[in-house]
Amino acid sequence: MKNALKSSFWKDCKNFLDQNHIAYFVDAIDGDMAEHSASIDGDVLETFRKYCLYGGLSNFKNLWLYANGLFDNKAEKAAPPEKYSWAGIYDPGAESRFQKTLSDFEAAHPYGDRPVLGLLFYRDEWIWDDTAYVNAFLEEAEKEGYAVLPVFANGFIDESAGMPSLSEVLETY
């Protein structure tokens, strides 16, 4: 997104939006690179950012409901941004699709004497249930006699939001 926000196309779009007093918000992985119109006040901007940062279908649905509610008092009310785990062990059989602790995961999936493979993948793939390749890896590794510890975490770490560093994730799991 960094490069897109520096493009002449975006600059032209931004000028058009500003000249016509059209509010806009552009999220970016690097929070300092995000852009928004001056007409969006701090509380609204913070709520937009939380919906985007926390991710997932319900947060994006509620982002649009929230934005709509800013202009229509009769609109469906948005739920507040919902925080999901920043990191965990993927467990497709669990109700939440993850385990928070290694001991919980080991209780649900005893390794026995099998060698354990670690698999680290992006949190967004877990949030959006985009885990087909992870599931295929689990299935194939188990066929070959391995146990797998599939851990998800953020690729871009914002410790101010409470995200653990990659080192912390690896030490924890």
Q: Where are each of the predicted segments found?
A:
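An N-terminal assembly and electron-transfer interface module characteristic of large anaerobic redox
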Residues: 1-173
